[in-house]
Amino acid sequence: MRMTSSSFVSYCTPGLCQFMAMLPTAGHLLPLLLVIGTGGTVPSPQVPPRGCYVAKEAGERTFRCSQAGLSAVPSGIPNDTRKLYLDANQLASVPAGAFQHLPVLEELDLSHNALAHLSGAAFQGLEGTLRHLDLSANQLASVPVEAFVGLQIQVNLSANPWHCDCALQEVLRQVRLVPGTGTGIVCGSGARPDLVGQEFLLLAGEEELCGSGWGGARRSTDVALLVTMGGWLTLMVAYLVHYVWQNRDETRRSLKRAPVLPVRSEDSSILSTVV
């Protein structure tokens, strides 16, 4: 026999009806199951840090954290983010694998921070996707070449206090500069005194800084070291020669001053007998 809702009500006793009323509806059943399955806690999505927000720009997922007072790369960035803006913060370094959880990231803005250190694996996992990277207006004096190996990107390196060494020349062989930013790559106070204030691209066009795998500044240091070592070696040889000659003269003078010992009579008679 088919039981309709009206017939069910007619057969429902007060105790049974009270029990059925206490059962959760279908809309509340799923959260209840989630609570049971997660040990009593309801999982919640990661909330962006204060000052950050997610937006869709030109149909692409964008995560903006500009001027958010960040001192480290934040967590909670959606893994489908294509454009990430971390500019105008207080980031001092980028650790290894900082963005490897963002498999479709195409554009990364790290400009106007306090970046002084870049890990050689800072952009690990972005080799096939990253296209634009902004590192301008930071405190970068040198960057590891391996950080850019495999990346097909346009990069802005202007407004940093570069050492203008072999490492920078190698980086520029790995990447393409954003048009119009090359003149902003200027040698900082930590560079060789004769390079400070000069545009690096002009220097790199006139001088090979990586001859035989060594930078020009490194070669100058090596030459100075060799000259110093040569000077010390010459002084040591001169001292040894002087010491030998002085000892030889002293030996001669000692021999001349040595007294002649008299021959005893017994020795003379023995000598005569032998003869």
Swiss-Prot record:
Cited Pfam families: LRR_8
Disulfide bond entries: none
Organism: Homo sapiens
Bilayer-spanning residue ranges: 225-245
PROSITE patterns attached to this UniProt entry: LRR (PS51450)
Domain of life of the native organism: Eukaryota
Localization in the cell: Membrane
Chief place where the protein resides: membrane
Record's protein name: Leucine-rich repeat-containing protein 3C
InterPro entries assigned: Leu-rich_rpt, Leu-rich_rpt_typical-subtyp, LRR_dom_sf, LRR_TM_domain-containing
Mapped LRR repeat ranges: 80-101, 104-125, 129-150
Keywords: Glycoprotein, Leucine-rich repeat, Membrane, Repeat, Signal, Transmembrane, Transmembrane helix
Residues linked to a glycan: 156
Signal peptide range: 1-41
